[in-house]
Every structure is written in structure tokens, then in C-alpha cells.
Swiss-Prot record:
The keyword Metal-binding applies. InterPro entries: ExoRNase_PH_dom1 (IPR001247), ExoRNase_PH_dom2 (IPR015847), ExoRNase_PH_dom2_sf (IPR036345), KH_dom (IPR004087), KH_dom_type_1 (IPR004088), KH_dom_type_1_sf (IPR036612), NA-bd_OB-fold (IPR012340), PNPase (IPR012162). This is Polyribonucleotide nucleotidyltransferase. Belongs to the polyribonucleotide nucleotidyltransferase family. Keywords: Cytoplasm, Magnesium, Metal-binding, Nucleotidyltransferase, RNA-binding, Transferase. NCBIfam families: polynuc_phos, PRK11824.1. It comes from Bacillus thuringiensis (strain Al Hakam). Involved in mRNA degradation. Catalyzes the phosphorolysis of single-stranded polyribonucleotides processively in the 3'- to 5'-direction.
Amino acid sequence: MSQEKQVFSIDLAGRQLTVETGQLAKQANGAVLVRYGDTAVLSTATASKEAKNVDFFPLTVNYEERLYAVGKIPGGFIKREGRPSEKAILASRLIDRPIRPLFADGFRNEVQVVSIVMSVDQDCSSEMAAMLGSSLALSISDIPFEGPIAGATVGRINGEFVINPTVEQQEQSDIHLVVAGTKDAINMVEAGADQVPEETMLEAIMFGHDEIKRLIAFQEEIVQAVGKEKSEVKLYEVDADLNQAVREMAEKDMHSAIQVHEKHAREDAINEVKKRVIEHYEAQEADADTLGQVNEILYKIVKEEVRRLITVEKIRPDGRKGDEIRPLASEVGILSRTHGSGLFTRGQTQALSICTLGALGDVQILDGLGVEESKRFMHHYNFPSFSVGETRPMRGPGRREIGHGALGERALEPVIPSEKDFPYTVRLVSEVLESNGSTSQASICGSTLAMMDAGVPLKAPVAGIAMGLVKTGEHYTILSDIQGMEDHLGDMDFKVAGTAHGVTALQMDIKIDGLSREILEEALQQAKVGRVHILNHMLSVIAEPRTELSAYAPKIITMTINPDKIRDVIGPSGKQINKIIEETGVKIDIEQDGTVFISSINQEMNDKAKKIIEDIVREVQVGEIYEGKVKRVEKFGAFVELFSGKDGLVHISELALERVGKVEDVVKIGDVITVKVIEIDKQGRVNLSRKVLLKEEQEKEAAKEENKQEQQ
């Protein structure tokens, strides 16, 4: 490969995409700088020279955000980037998933793919640039990668599909789809949608694949020009004689163990066979490498038999039919003090979701590379070790938990009511209590139940289902509601969430070379049937959102003030607003358009705070009549409080009809008198009159007396 800088360009969605090689990071096995519009991403690929002594492929994909890319300095005391943001973790997963299946079985060399985002143009996706850069860095390197792959974002505006939509277009789009794959097939889909029909989602996937083919052809040209020769790597293989011996010893018993229906009993039966075989070789003083190979052979026996049973005999590990869903059970309102809770159980998978409602000030503030600054709807997913009957240290959420939480959030977001209709921040937490496959989809079902229990007026209830596929040659079986073993040993994990009207989220990972359109179509339709079945079960537990919020949820009052008066409510250095909060114990959030949200558990305090704000922003008009309290008496007149924060002066000459010698002869401090606004001067001072009202009253009495005399 030439070390001179070379530049390659292609048009992508009306914007130029440029790839530069040979100048940066030349000690990596492969490195490219991808420029897309003003977005710039440096992608590198490196690999260890020797294979690692592990029983899996050690691939790490990192998508690294740098705040200098958007001209920001990190907050906090340290002033440098810390742990990856949620968006960065999701982008890393997005790149990892289509790349991972394209390394040969038995490849054990450690591979690290790093993409550093160096400049961001919001209309030109840094994730898509990083995906293309990661594929190219691997493809031009000497690492034995069977790519290239490419990805594309697809939107839909007014029924028309759009590739890599701009920020403005994304706001109008009812689909946000990321599709990735090779030139021959799709191997990864990640999508959010606004209740879009299955047929439309399939069309969008195929539309994205057409663009992928063009981007792969572009990459192949670059590989032809600057690619290194792939290195010869010895793949991990088990010894043929050992393979035969282990199979003769274990195959029959393992086949029987696999057909035990209950998860833990099946695992115990399989482990018993494994233990017997391992002990046999330990007695012969086999070394660690041999024992590792024995474990590998035993795993393959299980995998082959499970796949054969599903594809040929149409028997699933737990005895279900291909489209059969495990027994369902649901419950709501099981936690008294929470704002809403939902327990969803599907076979041996169980999720407890809790909904918490907060004021709009409780939104999550995002400090990243995107345009979005805050988030009022959140879904967090926790997967404790006890859910699978294991022990391990309790740490913060890993990549998988963040990914599953984001999938649930994407599935539910389209049905969350607008801020105008429901001025609350909504946080969902899904606790996985039991796991045997499809926990992310169980968390979606549990979250829907929790929000309905909390009284969130959802546009429609959402349910999710995980589909699987096992394909051997021309034989294939599509599985509804896959359990852990089917997910682990199958060829596809295809999660579909949505309402009765359409899809709201889709996530697909394929471990084989790819799927035909026909199989995808069949899987989507089978998923729809399963989803509707689950929805009907959920609606039998709670038919619609509760009409009243929990007694423990905050009550929110919305009011509108003149935007020019916002500064009066806040006061100098926030003194006024802090005084209201201290006096009433409420939370106050003010939007730039003058919308004010007052929230607390106590409705009485909300009303009190509202009255205070109304008084602050209330404007005095000439001609208005007030009943006010005398606050101060001077020689020239009396100061009267019309309402909180607003005083006016009744001059001594305006106190009474007759001449007044001393103000105190008519009023004293604390008296409540009725006054009329007669003038507001240029300095905003309010002049009041009691005399005018007394005169009007006198004239009314005189007119009444005159009428009385005429009638006599």
C-alpha cells in the first residue's frame, strides 16, 4: 500500500463524501479519514499479531466523541471528555453489529476498530461516516475481514423515501431507519417509526440496501487502489480425532438432554453430560488446550442438534410450535407509592417496569455532539445477575443494558403525548427479574402497562416481540418469541415493537450471509400476529390509561404570561422566583414563549404560587377599580397596595369630596379602601382616586332620588 496521501470522492444524498488515506495514523493496520460535508471522522483498525487463548472472537469497536468537534469545552472541573455518552455507546454497537459476522469462524486475533469524531456537520451523520470508515479501515488493512460493509439512514417524508435526511428532514420524517449490510444482503437494521405498516418498513429497508450497494462499490475501488494483501492467519480448529471421540462419547446423551423442556432442568441435563466428558479427559491428564477443544465440541453438538430439531423436525427446545408464544401474565399497580407500575411475564422472562412523572425541569440535559439539548422521556433497562440465577458484581449499566434501554425508548416515544397535552417529564425503569430471552421486548410491554397505570394518555399501547430464524441449506424456520437458547444458537435476532396500527421500533441482527426479501416479509407478518396477541392480553389487564394520576405524582398547573414579564417573575439574580419557591415549595419552569409550569404534590400550594405570579405580571389599566390596603401615609397622600407587588398613590386632593387637611383624618395604615386608577405617568407610577368613586356614588344617589320624586 502506498504511503502517499490519496483522496477518493462520491456523492452521498447530495453532499460530497471524501475518503483520505496514506496521511494519518500510518502505524495502524488500516486508517482512513472520512469527510462528509463538514463532518470528519478518523477510523482506524488494528489487530494483534498472535491469536488470543480465548473461546470467542475478541473484537472491540469504539466510537469516540470529542467535544471540540462542535466547538465546545467539556463541563465539570476536569474539563476533558469522561466516559462515553449514551449516543457514543449506541453508535459503537451500531458499527460492531454489521462488522462482527464478517470475520471467519475460528479467528481469535484481537481486533480493535476506533472511530474518532473530529468535526460535526449536523446534516451529515457522523455515525454513517464512522461506519463506512470502520469498514474501509478493515478492508484496506491486512486484517482478514470479509467485507466491506456500508450503512445508510433512511427517512420518509410525505410518502417519499430519503437517504441520510438532514436535521430538518428528520423532524418531518415518520421513519428513522439505519440499515447496514454487504453488497449481497442486509445484516443489520435499527429503526424507529411512527406506527408505520410492516410493508412500508420492508420497502424502506430495501431502498436503503440499494444505496449500500453503491457505497460498497466505491469502497471496492479504494481497496483496489490502496489495499494491503490480507495476512495468512491460522484459524482455531479442533482436532479431528478428538472431535470424533467426544461425539461418540456424548452425542446420544446430549441429544436427550436438549429435549428437556424446562430451561433450568435442560441446562442441568446438558451440564451433567459436559461434566462427565470433561472428567473423563481430566482423568487422562489432558492439558488446558485439549479441555478447551472438548468444550468447543460439546457446544457444537448442542448447536447442531438444536438447529436440526427446529429446521427438520420443527421441534423447539421447550416443545412449542414455531409461531407459538409462551404463556402470558400481567399485573399493574403492584407498588403503592410509585406513580405507576407494570409487571409483564412471558414464560420464564419477567420484567417489572416503573413509571415516574416529574416536572419539566426534570428533563435530562444532554451535553454531546447532537442538536438535541434535553430529553423529557427516558427509558432505563437494568439486568441484574439474579435474573439468570447467577452471581456477579453489581456495576453500572453496560453496553447491552444501554442498548436495550434505548430500543425500548425508541419503541415507546412515538406514543408519548406532547408536552402541550401532558406537561410532565416521564422516566421509565425496567427491572428484569427473570430472563430466558426477549427481555428487551418484555420491558416494552411492562413499560406500556406502567404508563397506563400512571395515567399517561398514550396515543396507543405498544407491545414488542423477538423473532428468530434457523436456516440450514434451503430449510428454514421462523420462530416467534424466541428464548435464550434459540437466540444464542439461531441465525437471526429480529425484535419488532409497535401498536395495533404499525411498527414503532425494529432491531435486527443476522449472523449468516443475509436474508432474502421473502424471509424478511414472512418474519414481519408473523411478528405482527404475535404482537397483536400480546397487545390483546395487555388490554385485558388494563383497557386504557387511568383517568387520574397517582396521589403521589406531582400536580402541574400551566399558565401563560407576557414574555416581557418573565424577568419580573424571576427577579434580580433569581430573588423573586426563589422567594416564591421557598414560600410555596413548588417547582417553577418558564419557557421563552411565556408558558409557565408550576408543579408540586400539593394543589393548594400550586394555586398559591399561581396567584403570586398572576399578581407580579398583572398590569394596571387606567379606569380599573381596586380594593386595596393602605400601606403608607405621607403628608401629600396615601400609598395603597392594589395587589402583591403593585402600589399606587391617592393624592390628598383625591381622598374625599371635601377638602382634606390631614391624610390621617380620612385613612390610616391598614384600612381597606376602594380606588380607581386615573393615571399612569411616563415613569410607570400609578395615580389613584377615591374622590372620583365617591362622586360617582353621589351622582347615582341623586339620580335615584330624582326618579323617586318623579314617580310620586
